[in-house]
Amino acid sequence: MTLLNVSNLTVDFRQDSVTTHAVRGVSFKVEKGETVALVGESGSGKSITALSTVNLLPDSAQLAGSITYNGQELVGASDKVLRGVRGNDISFIFQEPMTSLNPLHTIEKQLAESIELHQGLRGPAVRERIVDLLDRVGIRDAESRLTSYPHELSGGQRQRVMIAMALANGPELLIADEPTTALDVTIQAQILDLLEDLKRDSAMSMLFITHDLTIVRKIADRVCVMKDGEIVETGPTDQIFANPQHPYTQMLIAAEASGQAAPVPDDAPVMAETENLRIWFPIKRGLLRRTAGYVKAVNDATLTVRAGETLGIVGESGSGKTTLAMAIMRLINSTGRIAFVGNDIHELNQKQMRPLRSDMQIVFQDPFGSLSPRMTVEQIVTEGLDIHRAGEKIDKKQLVADILTEVGLDPALMSRYPHEFSGGQRQRIAIARAMILRPKLVVLDEPTSALDMTVQAQIVDLLRDLQQKYGLAYIFISHDLKVVRALSHKMMVMRAGDVVEAGSVADVFDNPQTDYTRELLAAAFEGRSIA
């Protein structure tokens, strides 16, 4: 029986005299007990389509076509009808729970609001229902978490709270909009397992929105592939993956980062190395703020990376990956030995460090956050030249044009601002800013995790080309093991500040030695969690 029927849906946004066609002629069905995946890249219209189901769109949106839920027409329905469907019959889980949960309210208060509004429960019955929901979504010691605020929970726990909120009123249809994109692979696998269990136990249907085809293969019964506001292909999941018909679907499936790093010459010089590196943060307690212990962010890490070589550092959030890289660049204090191009940088003062700074650069995860919105591309890319090559007679504009061309951007765009570019283009700008100084070591801190899979593959190819051309040493931080395998020569696995495994990429992937590494690999490549 058809639960949700979307027929010839069109969504336009009008601003002044400009009309943007966000969704065009979209049609699909969700049957009872079925999971349908809407797949596509950023801007394809996936989320707009989902939000249209219960008209959660801004006033500037104009809907046409038909959306029926259990036979009831929702396009043009009154607010009273839509309120009855929202939360009760159709619930949403969004990508980033930190922005969906109110930071000023406890978990109990936020869950109680929905239960009291839709179910009419009061007093102890509400608390009992909340504890039951938190238990169902796998939050341990649920009663003690009722007084917690969102910032006191991990990313995975916050997403579980969002799922509990969505399930509070027993919906028949759950719409999940990229619910695992911001999570580590092991947590991602746990959330997917949880959603599958809840769907089965509650006989619920699910509309799952994602750009990650690994998730689609695991969770969906049918797939709708979206591009530029249209569904270009639809069919059973197995059929779509085994025999994709549309060129765009074929490109999406082939877009995973692939290949392997080029061999490193035996005589390649060591660019950076550490020995027994520690970063411990003291825990201060009491009136006199005495040290009661330490948070061991990084504990006795030893590594080497040579010219032309990539060291991949993997692990979940909080494992110490980024902290280790920051210490190697001497951006935070540490103990132990750090050598950069033969210099023990612990022995250098700030003035002595400055000439080395241009040789070590970093590319961050979110280019929108790391690029100044008030600076043009030209100003952003030349900033390093202004600091490290001030006084030199150089044609900065030509250098910017050359490096933009090298990273695959049109130099004619250098007068534009970051907001005028896509996510992939912004990351290319960040790479250009790092590369214009011709560094010897580049730290890449999750540079592809915020990007669509096709753009991920392009950035990996670009980084590989630049490395081969200039003999760059990379420290590549990621929780995406597929990208690590495509780009890295060696890898380290970190957990709670400790290096639990290290070796060549082939050795670690083909013959992992620790249970934790095996769990990471299973979560990344099989989409399953290991208890």
Regions found by a protein language model. Give the residues of each.
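Conserved ABC transporter NBD signature motif
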Residues: Q62-E73, G336-D344
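A short, proline-enriched helix->beta-strand linker immediately N-terminal to the Walker B motif
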Residues: A168-E172, I436-K440
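A short, surface-exposed alpha-helical micro-motif characterized by mixed small hydrophobic
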Residues: V216-K218, V484-A486
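ABC ATPase "signature
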Residues: I231-G235, N243, V499-G503, N511
